[in-house]
Amino acid sequence: PMNSSAASDVYKRQSLDMAVNYAKERYAFGRPIGSYQAIKHKLADMYIALTLAKSNCYYAAWALSTDSADLPSASATARVSAIKAYQLCSQENIQTHGGNGFTWEYDCHMFYRRSKLLSLNLGSLSNWREKLVTSLEQSNIN
């Protein structure tokens, strides 16, 4: 789970970078679209989700390397946050690009489809949420 969580970090970052670059280059009403509050908030949300997912992945890696009792919940948390962050980043990347987001001239659609594929790679989001709940219940019982 952590390998795919870490691998998706690269794709999340590429989605964010693509959206930021497009927001700087694309002009509407004489200003870059990145200067508008709605776009700024989308980019900020993408960055926050990416950073939280990376932090959770680091925590899961630490739990694995130290044989921590938190490993089941840490790895499930890393996977859930990675899936959600990648889906958010790929969706908001498309939204930032507007109508161009689903054209073949831009790679936004590729990141969106890859986010769907990676989310099913080792189990669905609901599956990993259930694993997280189970591991948290077990840790509270002990």
What are these regions (language model features)?
Residues 20, 24, 31, 47-81, ...:
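C-terminal helix-coil-helix/basic helical segment that borders enzyme active sites and/or dimer interfaces
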Residues 62, 86-112:
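A glycine-biased, small/acidic residue-tolerant capping/turn segment at secondary-structure junctions
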Residues 32, 36, 42, 99-103, ...:
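Gly/Ser/Thr-rich beta-alpha loop segments that engage phosphate groups in nucleotides
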